[in-house]
């Protein structure tokens, strides 16, 4: 499996990079230790950060929103998922508990400010490309109606788009039956140490999701 970034994105967003982790896993419903960390450590820390600088003051959220503008998408109407998570924390709503992979994915996103997505590779066909959503392009979102992905940076395989930093499609969603996963960090900041983020993400996935045989790589 190859992952690459198409010129339709690179020409508009020079700083775009992808941090990738591919691994084997037995997905479970919940990890209590992870939720202890989220509720007792991460959520209170983020409330303080948001009070101090605001959500738009978080550098990696801001750079992601700038990337959307460069591609011709309104980031206030189509929010990057990391901003949506921060807004839930600000409003005291916490996070939805999904499963050990998705919950760890959300921890990574909260800690970095970047959107992250996790995808079941048995439902991904061929190579993966990050490209600009085509005119009129849509897909069925997880827990949502059809999402307009025109001008969004979208992940696509040989069959079409299946993911984005805003909301993923149902095609490759992670379930309790998933066994081979790609977790991908959408990085739109040239200053961020992506290798360091990948190492921390690997640690979290091993600890909280039971991930094994993790391969990490970056795409520019």
Where are these regions (language model features)?
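Charge-biased, low-complexity intrinsically disordered regions
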Residues: 1-220
